[in-house]
């Protein structure tokens, strides 16, 4: 791996001022070069870590914003290998953790061991396969341990105590909490069930908790911080800025920087 060495999630959480701000983007949306500049802008605006989605033709867990981003990236010619090349270029200017959010079919198609080997080579810190339950993750867990990559799983409001215990046993890095049931997208408020879920997961295990799906406003970040979340993952709100400014790259980057700065500040310890 060339470029900066990846910071661990543990170190990132130690360094974060309050609630960590972690933006999500789709690799190659709307094209490789613009995607790189978007990520650079997010890092410059204070992102504590990055979540990068690899575009997929049938993203079942994602709402219209991320589906649109996937489609733009695929139309721009993005492949799994080009996504890894993008990560390598990001590693040239930042050491913050980079997590992948992918569908297991992409991993399976390349071969589990080869996917994780290539991810480690590119500088990936953690991998979350959105449609991979822990009960079926033995190959992924083996590869993650082999290549020193954190394997992350989704925890939802419907996750029972026994399943949460199992997830806690095999996860590393952090727990990814789904803030609302259903697909991703910017929501207007934080549900009470999300706050209760944060408390339940924090009581169960020792891993930090990051909340995604629907986080889009400064007040969301403050509420989640106050409920005990260690970080927030913001995707659809940022992707909406991308899709709304495709004709003006400079304005797009300016608005992304402004949004990221506002959300980062909202999570501060005060």
Swiss-Prot record:
Record's protein name: Tryptophan synthase alpha chain
Organism: Methanothermobacter thermautotrophicus (strain ATCC 29096 / DSM 1053 / JCM 10044 / NBRC 100330 / Delta H) (Methanobacterium thermoautotrophicum)
Family designation: Belongs to the TrpA family.
Entry EC no(s): 4.2.1.20
GO cellular component: cytosol
Keyword terms: Amino-acid biosynthesis, Aromatic amino acid biosynthesis, Lyase, Tryptophan biosynthesis
Metabolic or biological pathway, per its Swiss-Prot or TrEMBL entry: Amino-acid biosynthesis; L-tryptophan biosynthesis; L-tryptophan from chorismate: step 5/5
PANTHER family to which the protein is assigned, alphabetical: TRYPTOPHAN SYNTHASE ALPHA CHAIN, CHLOROPLASTIC, TRYPTOPHAN SYNTHASE, ALPHA CHAIN
GO molecular function: tryptophan synthase activity
Enzyme class, spelled out: lyase
């Amino acid at each position: 791996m060339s470029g900066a060495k990846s910071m661990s999630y543990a170190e990132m959480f130690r360094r974060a001022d309050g609630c960590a701000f972690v933006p999500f983007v789709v690799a190659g949306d709307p094209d490789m070069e613009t995607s790189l500049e978007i990520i650079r802008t997010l890092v410059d605006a204070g992102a504590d870590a990055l979540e990068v989605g690899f575009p997929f033709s049938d993203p079942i867990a994602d709402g219209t914003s991320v589906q649109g981003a996937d489609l733009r990236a695929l139309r721009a010619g993005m492949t799994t290998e080009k996504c890894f090349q993008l990560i390598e270029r990001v590693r040239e200017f930042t050491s913050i953790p980079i997590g992948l959010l992918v569908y297991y079919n992409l991993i399976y198609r390349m071969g589990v061991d080869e996917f994780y080997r290539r991810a480690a080579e590119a500088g990936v810190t953690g991998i979350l396969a959105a449609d991979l339950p822990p009960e079926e993750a033995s190959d992924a867990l083996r590869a993650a341990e082999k290549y020193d990559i954190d394997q992350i799983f989704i925890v939802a409001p419907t996750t029972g105590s026994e399943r949460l215990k199992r997830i806690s046993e095999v996860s590393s890095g952090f727990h990814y909490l789904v803030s609302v049931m259903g697909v991703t997208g910017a929501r207007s408020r934080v549900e009470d069930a999300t706050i209760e879920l944060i408390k339940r997961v924090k009581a169960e295990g020792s891993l930090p908790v990051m909340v995604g799906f629907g986080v889009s406003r400064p007040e969301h970040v403050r509420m989640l911080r106050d409920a005990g979340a260690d970080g927030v993952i913001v995707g659809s709100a940022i992707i909406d800025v991308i899709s709304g400014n495709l004709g003006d790259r400079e304005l797009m980057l300016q608005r992304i920087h402004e949004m990221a700065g506002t959300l980062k500040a909202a999570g501060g310890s005060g």
